[in-house]
Amino acid sequence: MFTYITSLPSPEWEKSFPRTISILGSTGSIGTNALDVIKSHKELFHIVALGGGKNVQLLAKQAIQWKPDYLAVQDETSKEALIPLLPINYKPSIFVGQQGYVKLASLPEVTTVLSAQVGAAGLHGTVAAAKNGKVICLANKETLVLAGKLIKNLCLQSGAVILPVDSEHNAIFQALYTRNPKTVQNIILTASGGPFRNKKYEFLKNVTPEQAINHPNWKMGTKISVDSATMINKGLEIIEAHYLYGLPSEQIKIVVHPQSYVHSLVEFTDHSLMAHLGTADMRMPIAHCLAWPNYLNVGVEPFVLSKIGTLTFEEPDLDSFPCINLARDALVAGTSAQIILNAANEVAVDAFLKKQIGFMDIPILISKALEADSTPEPTTLESIEALDQQTRHTISQWIEVH
């Protein structure tokens, strides 16, 4: 039965503005879109902290514009490069590394944390936000893939709230949060099919990174663009959906919808469907979470049904895109398999982008890693991280002898 991962904010939250914001991953695709949303509604938000990894040039520009009290970067080298880029009369506290992001997520003056780092790097910051009772706008699906049970328990203990930023899960959330849980039959996640929809193995084995990151509908970072091309992003979203909505794998369906206008659907017990439609623009789900339960105009063109033409739907090609079923297998197998799946994928995608392996080597490496799994279920952040690092090391060694 559908059960949402956390409670929702109190009724007073609707009018609780300005909201104090910490953005983990401010220089990435989600982070820059979030700042664009906030720029359109400055009266509603106050940016307290920005974390920007190694992209110190962009982080410096953001810091000069928004003047947050706190910044975080990936390492000491990045900190040394950032300081000269800031005005002499602007002296924010600058934190470094993983613990820097933990600090940004734990600040007592922050009410809302946007978790927008890419991959497993977002785990520690999200865990810290969950421990400290924050409203978490979650754009980092890997956090739940790695530590869904842990995050859920921490949120229940602290009163933290998760609001999903992923367009598919944001659509499901909007359709479900006022519904009777007993009436939900299935949730249906839509997939564009990526740049290689309808392509077969003979084509896919020769695709280049440049082709893989050229998504037909969405503007995204390189890693998630490759995930879309292999369709493992849908697999990760199945696992994310399991933790967000408490549904088993068989009640989480995938349908390919090339136009990306229908962001997801809910099927009820009478077999009726509720769909969420809109323009493919990440500013909309970001704004929905930042301002929840309010809706903001963020400059997206009106969605006119009479102008969009035909909507088409088809089943995913599971033979050409085996990563979907690899993710389903990992969900059924448990936490250790989910950690291995994610770590193997991140290392394999990085190697593909560096042209060390081929596109179809990505699912092969993931499958090989899952087959080798004999690890007890990790229950702590430390054991989760240890398995993640162990898997990365193993996959990297395999790639070296590839």
From Swiss-Prot:
Q: What is its EC number?
A: 1.1.1.267
State a single Gene Ontology molecular function.
Answer: 1-deoxy-D-xylulose-5-phosphate reductoisomerase activity
The record's listing under InterPro entries reads: DXP_reductoisomerase, DXP_reductoisomerase_C, DXP_reductoisomerase_N, DXPR_C, DXPR_C_sf, NAD(P)-bd_dom_sf
Question: What Pfam families does this protein map onto?
Answer: DXP_redisom_C, DXP_reductoisom, DXPR_C
Q: Give the record's pathway.
A: Isoprenoid biosynthesis; isopentenyl diphosphate biosynthesis via DXP pathway; isopentenyl diphosphate from 1-deoxy-D-xylulose 5-phosphate: step 1/6
Q: Which reaction does it catalyse?
A: 2-C-methyl-D-erythritol 4-phosphate + NADP(+) = 1-deoxy-D-xylulose 5-phosphate + NADPH + H(+)
Give the domain of life: Bacteria
Q: In which residues is 1-deoxy-D-xylulose 5-phosphate bound?
A: K141, S167, E168, S192, H215, S228, N233, K234, E237
Enumerate the Gene Ontology biological process terms.
isopentenyl diphosphate biosynthetic process, methylerythritol 4-phosphate pathway involved in terpenoid biosynthetic process
Q: Which cofactor does it need?
A: Mg(2+); Mn(2+)
For Mn(2+), which residues are the binding ones?
D166, E168, E237
Keywords from UniProt, A to Z, are: Isoprene biosynthesis, Manganese, Metal-binding, NADP, Oxidoreductase
Q: Which residues bind NADPH?
A: T27, G28, S29, I30, G53, K54, N55, N140, E142, G221
Q: Does the keyword NADP apply?
A: yes
UniProt xrefs under Gene3D superfamilies: 1.10.1740.10, NAD(P)-binding Rossmann-like Domain
Q: Member of which family?
A: Belongs to the DXR family.
Q: What job does this protein perform?
A: Catalyzes the NADPH-dependent rearrangement and reduction of 1-deoxy-D-xylulose-5-phosphate (DXP) to 2-C-methyl-D-erythritol 4-phosphate (MEP).
This protein is called what? 1-deoxy-D-xylulose 5-phosphate reductoisomerase
Record the organism.
Lawsonia intracellularis (strain PHE/MN1-00)
